[in-house]
Amino acid sequence: MVELAKRHPEGSFICGHTGGNWELGVRIIRDTKNVYAEVAGSDPTSGFTEMAVRELGAERVIYGSDVGGRTFASQVAKVIGADIPDSAKELILGGNLRRLLQPSLKAKGYAS
Protein backbone atom coordinates (compact mmCIF):
# COMPACT_ATOMS: atom_id res chain seq x y z
CA MET A 1 0.00 0.00 0.00
CA VAL A 2 2.74 2.45 0.95
CA GLU A 3 4.67 1.87 -2.28
CA LEU A 4 1.51 2.33 -4.35
CA ALA A 5 0.63 5.52 -2.47
CA LYS A 6 4.14 6.89 -3.03
CA ARG A 7 3.83 6.25 -6.78
CA HIS A 8 0.50 8.09 -6.82
CA PRO A 9 0.85 11.04 -4.43
CA GLU A 10 -2.22 12.74 -5.90
CA GLY A 11 -4.43 9.85 -4.78
CA SER A 12 -5.83 8.94 -1.39
CA PHE A 13 -5.61 5.37 -0.12
CA ILE A 14 -7.50 3.68 2.71
CA CYS A 15 -5.65 0.86 4.41
CA GLY A 16 -8.53 -1.48 5.29
CA HIS A 17 -8.26 -3.17 8.66
CA THR A 18 -5.07 -1.12 9.04
CA GLY A 19 -3.28 -3.90 7.22
CA GLY A 20 -4.40 -6.66 9.59
CA ASN A 21 -1.86 -5.95 12.34
CA TRP A 22 -2.97 -2.59 13.66
CA GLU A 23 0.15 -1.63 15.61
CA LEU A 24 2.48 -2.46 12.75
CA GLY A 25 0.06 -1.10 10.15
CA VAL A 26 -0.22 2.31 11.81
CA ARG A 27 3.56 2.59 12.06
CA ILE A 28 4.14 1.52 8.46
CA ILE A 29 1.76 4.11 7.00
CA ARG A 30 2.71 6.90 9.43
CA ASP A 31 5.01 8.79 7.04
CA THR A 32 2.86 8.30 3.94
CA LYS A 33 0.45 11.21 4.24
CA ASN A 34 -1.98 10.05 1.54
CA VAL A 35 -2.72 6.74 3.29
CA TYR A 36 -5.53 6.60 5.83
CA ALA A 37 -6.03 3.95 8.50
CA GLU A 38 -9.42 2.26 8.59
CA VAL A 39 -9.97 0.86 12.06
CA ALA A 40 -12.38 -2.02 11.44
CA GLY A 41 -11.79 -5.69 11.69
CA SER A 42 -9.65 -6.26 14.71
CA ASP A 43 -10.89 -7.09 18.14
CA PRO A 44 -11.86 -3.99 20.10
CA THR A 45 -8.43 -3.81 21.70
CA SER A 46 -8.01 -1.00 24.18
CA GLY A 47 -5.77 1.72 22.82
CA PHE A 48 -6.16 0.95 19.10
CA THR A 49 -7.94 4.17 18.16
CA GLU A 50 -5.87 6.27 20.54
CA MET A 51 -2.64 4.99 19.00
CA ALA A 52 -3.87 5.64 15.46
CA VAL A 53 -4.85 9.21 16.36
CA ARG A 54 -1.59 9.82 18.21
CA GLU A 55 0.58 8.45 15.38
CA LEU A 56 -1.38 9.68 12.34
CA GLY A 57 -3.63 12.47 13.54
CA ALA A 58 -7.41 12.15 13.67
CA GLU A 59 -7.59 13.45 10.09
CA ARG A 60 -6.10 10.17 8.82
CA VAL A 61 -8.25 7.68 10.73
CA ILE A 62 -11.50 6.31 9.27
CA TYR A 63 -14.18 4.22 10.93
CA GLY A 64 -15.22 0.92 9.40
CA SER A 65 -17.90 -1.46 10.65
CA ASP A 66 -16.48 -4.78 9.42
CA VAL A 67 -20.10 -5.79 8.94
CA GLY A 68 -20.45 -9.55 8.97
CA GLY A 69 -17.10 -10.04 10.68
CA ARG A 70 -17.65 -8.22 13.95
CA THR A 71 -20.62 -6.71 15.72
CA PHE A 72 -21.48 -3.13 14.94
CA ALA A 73 -21.37 -2.33 18.65
CA SER A 74 -17.82 -3.62 19.11
CA GLN A 75 -16.54 -1.65 16.14
CA VAL A 76 -18.21 1.67 16.91
CA ALA A 77 -17.22 1.30 20.58
CA LYS A 78 -13.55 1.44 19.55
CA VAL A 79 -14.15 5.03 18.49
CA ILE A 80 -16.89 6.20 20.86
CA GLY A 81 -15.10 4.76 23.90
CA ALA A 82 -11.66 6.00 22.89
CA ASP A 83 -9.89 8.55 25.05
CA ILE A 84 -9.73 11.18 22.29
CA PRO A 85 -11.51 14.52 21.84
CA ASP A 86 -15.08 14.53 20.53
CA SER A 87 -13.86 16.49 17.51
CA ALA A 88 -11.55 13.57 16.63
CA LYS A 89 -14.43 11.11 16.99
CA GLU A 90 -16.53 13.21 14.59
CA LEU A 91 -13.75 13.12 12.00
CA ILE A 92 -13.25 9.37 12.38
CA LEU A 93 -16.95 8.49 12.33
CA GLY A 94 -17.71 10.33 9.10
CA GLY A 95 -15.95 13.65 8.61
CA ASN A 96 -12.80 12.19 7.08
CA LEU A 97 -14.59 9.91 4.64
CA ARG A 98 -16.92 12.74 3.66
CA ARG A 99 -13.89 14.95 2.94
CA LEU A 100 -12.21 12.22 0.88
CA LEU A 101 -15.34 11.53 -1.15
CA GLN A 102 -16.30 15.18 -1.67
CA PRO A 103 -14.54 15.62 -5.06
CA SER A 104 -16.16 12.47 -6.48
CA LEU A 105 -19.58 13.31 -5.08
CA LYS A 106 -19.35 16.84 -6.43
CA ALA A 107 -18.32 15.60 -9.88
CA LYS A 108 -21.37 13.32 -9.94
CA GLY A 109 -23.74 16.07 -8.79
CA TYR A 110 -24.33 14.69 -5.29
CA ALA A 111 -22.62 17.51 -3.40
CA SER A 112 -22.05 21.20 -3.84
Descriptions of predicted regions:
Residues H17, A37, A52, D66, ...:
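Conserved, mostly hydrophobic/aromatic
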Residues M1-I62, G109-S112:
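Catalytic pocket-lining loop regions of alpha/beta-barrel enzymes
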Residues G41-T45, Y63-G68, K89-L93:
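Short, surface-exposed, polar/charged, turn-prone segments marking secondary-structure boundaries
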Residues A58-R60, T71-S112:
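Mid-to-C-terminal alpha-helical segments outside catalytic/metal-binding sites
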